[in-house]
Amino acid sequence: MIANERIKIRINQLEMMYPDSFHEMSEEKKAGLVFYKDSPGACLEDPEHHIIVTVGWTKPGIMAMMLNEKEAAKAAEKKISRPMAAHGYHLEEFSDTVLGGVKASGYRYHYHIQDTDMTGETLVVKYKKVFYYLNFYARTGLLEESFKIWHLILDTIVFEE
């Protein structure tokens, strides 16, 4: 399934581990990602399993500070749904979970790009006035195995002081 070795990464106060089959995505590949900006965080890929995971964080402005993780997830979904419509974007569901002992909200969706059916999931966590955005992208045909790997990563998340 996945390699036994795990690599630890810290993004602001979020710490997580990922399998050694992942590596930091090149700047050239990052530039091709529509919604990945130069925000602080990490952009990881596992070419063997065709998975991309991005993790970023932002300190929101005064108005956005009033949002909770569920409202921030809905705002993020609204932001991507219009431009992704050209790629057959379809929202599957909104959901809630817990990551590292902190409430998280997110959404799962499907789209089609470069002749490939894809599934994405975004999870939003608000921890100490900072929003963390965790994004997962995988080929829909490989989803069962990909979700196992994604959830192994999510299960390692802790928030440090």
Language model features with spans:
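N-terminal targeting sequences that direct proteins away from the cytosol to non-cytosolic compartments
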Residues: 1-50, 58-67, 75-103, 110-118, ...
